[in-house]
Amino acid sequence: MFDKNIYVERRKQLQHAVGSGLVVLLGNEESSMNYKDNLYPFRQDSSFLYFFGIDRPALIGIIDIDNDSEIIFGDDFTTEEMIWTGYREPLNLLSDSIGVSIVKPRKDLWSFMRLATEHKKTIHFLPPYRPEQHDLLADLLGVSSGSLSGMFSISLIKAIVAQRSYKSAVEIEEINRAVNTTAAMQLAAITLAKAGMTEAQIAGKMQEIAIGAGGNLSFPTILTQQGQILHNGYSHSLLTAGNLVLSDCGAETGMHYAGDLTRTFPVSNTFTTIQRDVYDIVLHAHGSAVALLQPGKPFRDVHLHACEKLTEGLQELGVMKGDAKEAVSMGAHALFFPCGLGHMMGLDTHDMENLGEQYVGYNDEIKKSTQFGLKSLRLAKPLEEGFVVTVEPGLYFNPALIDEWEANNQLGSFINYEKLKAYRNLTGIRVEEDFVITQNGSRVLGNPLAKTANEIEVLRLG
């Protein structure tokens, strides 16, 4: 946990922003894999962690704004339960460590909420993303499950986004720790991978590093020779000479702050000419985008700039043609880059995504596009000091998508389908780093990690 005063001040700020009513923040429950006592690793809700800090299941945090009081509802472990789990600190001591003096049994929550409803208090809660949260809220509010979806509090969402978007110095330190562990995971992948090993073997080594550092993965590792499939995970496929490996991974610290880095490397230790040409295009787009990071710059503009650089690079290879800006405005580049340039990062890898992209990544002036590729951009609004963002351009050659576009000569004035044939099986290349926006620009997070094609080859050659 952070210092007690950090949690106290966070809740005061939230109380002031919301103004009145009752804020209900649900912690997560344990989740069973296949029977009650065989559990998935517990992961606390990120907003509960941000305001209440206690990493324990089945807790509910209440901020009663009108009465200026805070309550945690939950139960201590029984002696019988601790035979199986080991000692668990009493909840009143944990609550005291984050500045909450009132602790009540979970069973008292129903009468508390019923009284709040009878007094016509405004009850603020976040959209639930787990079925058990959904059912609990419906039960507490005395409404049907079907009617709950329209009842969540937009004012609470906006208030939480406004707080969690700006990372404090202690949060940056924690994120930097996560990125350092993530860099160690990537270094292991680049140096250990050999033809004949499986993707899963490498992913297992990476997870070992994350757990050994005191945390876990911040998301399931993407370690694949099919990098054109954006979230392909890993398999038991053998690493094969001539292929590229796209490695996108993240570590999470013990306090659940995330890292997220991507590197692409050749199984054969050196890139082929075609692979290196495309890799250098991606790397140039990455550097060009990073140079634009600064407060006030809409991230959508950074994304579109990177798209233009990717397009210009493909034009030099003869794969694309025409005016680069026009090609991007028409969405021709999305055949090769059908996703966004990056996202916010913090307690979640895609920070606060459960609260809604329209609130986290957009604003009243900048709305989500419906265009293929651009509609997948998670962050578009102007950057501000204290934001933590990823920058992750890539080029992806998906044969199924290429065939579909070519069959219709889709945007054929910008794409040379004949030249593209030489690249259709290249798979995918992505380079990703994490940045904090500073007063005058940005700063890369984490220890240095090989990034250029030459640096990658030096590591591969050992």
Where on the chain are the PLM-derived regions?
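Active-site neighborhoods and metal-handling regions in enzymes and metal-associated proteins
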Residues: 1-462
